[in-house]
Every structure is written in structure tokens, then in C-alpha cells.
Amino acid sequence: LFELRGEMSLLKTVLPNVVQSIRAFRVADLQDEAARLGQHFLYAYCADALTKQQVLAGIAEAFHFPKHFGKNFDALADCLTDLTFKAGPQPGFLVVLEQIPNTPKFDKEARETLLDVFRDAADFWGEKKVPFRVFYSFQ
């Protein structure tokens, strides 16, 4: 199931639709694996963001969301699911959210809400049998 052209996948122990800590995975290896599998690789480095708007703007820019993206969690959910689904068949997604901040204006609750949006997107794509794996790290 996780084998491709006789090679074992880096992701053999990772469910196809999951949000998890990046742990021992390296970003470059995940990017290579996404390319090998023909999946979209989406990467956002969030360490410089201090507020929800800055975190969401950084993700929107990194993921090439439309200019009209409305820097809120509902807009993020729409871009990760419906808008992308309407664009046509998708091969799969490997997402890395690196250094999600913990600041007074982006606290633990905001981080959990952000990850919940990505969990909901993983469920959405899972129902469509499209892999959607998210790896994250916190500051």
C-alpha cells in the first residue's frame, strides 16, 4: 500500500489523512517524498508571526491562496477544502507548518484552532480518498 516502484515510502508509518508533530521527520525529506509521490508540498514557516492575522497571512502567501483570502479560520478552511476541490482532481497533499508561534496574540487556544482547521481538512480529503498529511512544530 505504501510502496512505490519497489521503494519503501518515508511515510509508511504515517496515516494518509493525519495532523501530527513533525518529530524526527526533516522538511527536506518530506518535500522529496511529496515530489516522489506526485503530491502537492505546502510549506509555511510561521516563526516570524505574532498574531492570528500574521499566521494566516503567512500561510496564505506560502500556499498561494487567492488575493481575496480573508485572514480568518473559516477562510482558511474554505481554501484548504472546497476551493481546492473545485479546481479539479488532486493527487494528495503533504503540508508542513513549521514553528507555529506561542505569543500573547496567538496563544495555545489559537494554535489548537489552527490545527483543528487542518484536521477538518484532512477529514474532508480522507472522505474523497485523497491523502492530506500535515506535520507541524511549535516555537
What residue ranges belong to the model's regions?
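Positively charged, polar, low-complexity stretches
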Residues: 2-139
